[in-house]
Structures are given as C-alpha cells and as structure tokens.
Amino acid sequence: MSAAPTTPTASTPMMRQWERIKAQHPDTLLLFRMGDFYELFHDDAHIAVRELELVLTKRGKDANAVPFCGVPYHAGERYIAQLVGKGYRVAICEQVEDPKYARGLVKREVVRVLSPGTILEDSFLSSVGAAKGNNYLAALTANADFSRFGLALLDISTGEFLAGEIAGNRKETGNTQQALLQAPASDDSNRWSALREELLRFAPAEVLVPQHLRECSGFLELLQSLQLLTTAFDSTGFDEPRQKLLNQFRTASLRGFGLEEYPVAQEAAALALDYLQSTQLGALGHVRRIGLLATEEWMQLDNATRRNLELVQSLRDGSTRGTLLGLLDETKTGAGARLLKKWVLQPLLEKERIERRQEAVAEFLGNVLLRRDTRDLLKNIGDIERLVSRAVTGQGNARDLVALRNSLQTLPALDATLQHINAAAIAKVRNHLNPAPELLQLLEQSIAD
C-alpha cells in the first residue's frame, strides 16, 4: 500500500527546498515528488484543485499553514495530460537519489518541463488534439522595423522542423520604431496579415515570444485575437543563431537547407531549439534537418477558404466529421494521417507532381489484392517518427520499444509487396524504407514478450 502524502510546513527544510526549486520555475505548476505522490503547494495547489477536482488540505493550523494537494505517482501521467491540455506548463520534480541512502534531505531536481508545444507521449498529444496531426511549437522573431518576421515550427514529437521569413507588408508611412511598437494591429492590418495566415494555417500549440515582440502591442493583440497560447522566452545560449543551427545539424553551411540567406528565420529556429533544450533537459538528436517554409509549391488557401470548405474542421462542432479529411482518412499509421492532412491543406500546383501522385493512387485503385495486402501490413507499423523521438529524448518505455521492433519487422514484407508497383512515387518510398537490421537485431535480443 502506498504511503499517504506528507507535506512540509513552511519552516521545514523540505519546504525550503520546494521554495528554491519553485523560484527557478515560477511560471509552471511544480509537481514535487514525495514518496509515492506528486504534491503541489500554495497557488499551484489551488489551481490543481480547480482544474483536476482534487481535495485541498493544509499542513498546520496557524497563519503559516501550507495549502497543498497531491496525486499518486503511478497516475501522474493522466493528471499531467489534463493540465497540459488546458494550457498549463508543468515542471516534474523527481527524487534523484534513493531515500534509503540519503544523508538528510532527499535530493530533488526538475527533470522535465512540459507545455503544450513540448510534449511527446501519446496521452499528452491526445489531450491537445494532436493524436493524428502535428503538434508544432512556433517561435517568432522580427527585424528592427517589423518589415520581416521569422517563423520557426518544430514538432518535437516527430522531429519535423521548418523555418522561413514572412514579409510584414508594412506601409511606408515614415513611422518610427517606437510608433510601430505602440500601434495596435487594427491600425495597419496589412502589416500582420501574412503572419496571421501562417499562424492560422499551422495552428501551433504554443508560440514563443521574445522580448522585442512582447513590447509590440499590435503583435500581442494579434496573438490574443487568434487565441494562441504564448510563452515569453528569450535565448539564453552563447552561440549566435546561425552557429547554433550549424552545431545542431553538424554542418558547415545552411545553404543545403535553403536558410543561409534568411537571418531572421535563423533567429527564430535557434529560439525554438533553445527553448526545447531548456525544457527537455537533454539533447534533441532526432532533430537532424530543417526545411524552408516555402509556399510556391502549393495553392494558397486562406483561413476563410479552409474554414468555409470544411477541409479539416467542421463548422458545426469543430471535429473532422463531415469534412473532406474525414471522408478521405482511411490511413493506418500516424505518419500517414499527418501526411494526408497536409495534402488536404496544401493542394499541389505543379502538373508533373500531381500526375505522379495520381499514378500511384491509380495503381492501388486498380489492384484490390495489392491494396488489401498493403493495408494489412501498414496496420502492424506504429508511429515510427514518434516512437524514435521518445526513445532519443529518454521518454520511451517498453511498449514503445515493442512497437518499434514490430514496425521494423514488417518493413521487408512491405517492401516486397510494393515492388510490384511501377509508379515513380512508390519507387521513391521504397528507396526510403530502411529496416535498420542492426537496430532490429538489438531489439529482438533485448525484448522478451
């Protein structure tokens, strides 16, 4: 049986330890590990009681009594998912030494900070509506006169990383920088329109806002109108943005990624990396490349068009039921679901690319047995992008490793099935199917079902 939660009073060494750690993470709900429980104190406790329907109690009867509540450690993921799903940042503070061997107070440290844009686990992703879609963390920067914005989008759950620059479309009115900072968004809607459309298109779960943008009333007004969760964050690294990206991707130039000539985009991308490294407290080894946010390849559909056509979201209840995506989505894998959503929102413009995609679809439409066999194999393939992301960041578990093993075991059979298709698009897919035999052998030897 688990021990009941114990709570330090304000004068105890444990409460002073909590106060020291809380001071380092003032904008989070601090889940403080005490034995078999996570406990929350003071204002954190009041918030948790309201949001999680817990019981508030106090330690002590005098004016220094400490309000607190707790949740069992083994059920922590469920409660954390609820808090993150409601937009809170949660710091996980663990006991980092065995209490049996501790000399005095057990050492505790924050091992991870969770927020809507930094989550990896399936239950957390479901809580923010990203089970079948991307979960982007956005980082925004701007040059001195707000004529160009840098936008970076990083999905830590898949490793996808995009960055680009957006013209501010500012009218040449002779405004000083101070006037620009103070002007509301409504004074010059053109200045923000392109940025607004990109934020609506990607719908990030969280937006990082550095100091120079936090001072701009029009920019803050824009984010508030979009009801986006914002996090104040400034780069804490010593490397300048370009060098930080070069270090991350282990390259001597960003030219191969298309970003060499976009310094504002580089700044936004570096900001996103800084934030994730500070919250995950570890390396981001699965983030191995970055792509340029290019719009020339797709038909540009503004938010009003996407909404009125009900491409991915119903006007009635906001779900996918009755939408084009809801009609088309028969995908069997997480990666397939994300890709289909992107295709629906980004229709191709180039005739040759459209025809290559149609050729591949026609192959499956014309061969019932091939289609059936391929779908049956895809059922055995997990969300490899997210499985690998959790493993690399140290957040994976035994179920993830079993799912990864099963997925890798299926790839040779999938490749053999697809070899009967002549379409160029499928040949390209086959070229990227890598069963990773050494990794598979390690998993098979290490896992006992």
Where are the regions a protein language model picked out?
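Conserved interaction-surface patches within small, structured recognition/assembly domains
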Residues: 366-371
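Aromatic-lined, polymer-binding surfaces characteristic
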Residues: 375
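Charged catalytic and DNA/RNA-contacting regions of genome-maintenance
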Residues: 2-363, 379, 383-392, 396-449
